[in-house]
């Protein structure tokens, strides 16, 4: 709950109240919570950083990837199982975070119908990357070769279409 921004010192936050007002299982609320998890929870960040959208990854290969990243084998197996639990919740079914098969894990392009979720993702990205001037070109979101402290919202949400981004950004500026 803390990593999702919902609980601070055993009390619900203003963010939790906002999510409650929106409806816990709405795409908007799920998107906002997942954005917080992406930037505050190392396990969710690992999924984003290491699993590309639309690619099928054998669960055993994902375990090997985790072990190569110095995760203990037992923990690696647990992290792979946790992905299925996440995708079985509204994060997977409503937000479209991803899905699993018997053998594979897949991360999916999010369903984001509320541009405020994208705006929040951009805000958290800028904050995580300590970008004081808060200015960057759209191409910066797509460049995955840049070493930075936070995952690009393009990678996080699986939105790699420049025209889709332009439409979203124009919608935000209206």
What residues fall within each predicted segment?
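Donor-sugar nucleotide-binding helix/loop cap in glycosyltransferases
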Residues: 2-174
């Amino acid at each position: 709950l803390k990593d999702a921004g919902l609980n601070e010192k055993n009390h619900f936050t203003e963010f939790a109240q906002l999510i409650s007002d929106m409806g816990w299982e709405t795409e908007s609320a799920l998107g906002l919570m997942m954005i917080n998890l992406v930037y505050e929870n190392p396990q969710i960040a690992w999924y984003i950083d290491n699993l590309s959208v639309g690619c099928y990854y054998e669960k055993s290969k994902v375990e090997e990837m985790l072990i190569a990243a110095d995760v203990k084998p037992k923990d690696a197996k647990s992290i792979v199982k946790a992905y299925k639990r996440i995708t079985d919740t509204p994060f997977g079914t409503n937000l479209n975070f991803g899905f699993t098969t018997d053998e594979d894990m897949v991360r999916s392009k999010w369903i984001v119908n509320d541009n405020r979720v994208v705006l929040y993702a951009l805000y958290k990205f800028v904050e995580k990357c300590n970008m004081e001037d808060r200015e960057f070109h759209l191409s910066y979101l797509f460049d995955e070769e840049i070493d930075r402290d936070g995952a690009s919202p393009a990678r996080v949400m699986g939105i790699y279409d420049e025209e889709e981004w332009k439409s979203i950004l124009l919608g935000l500026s209206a």
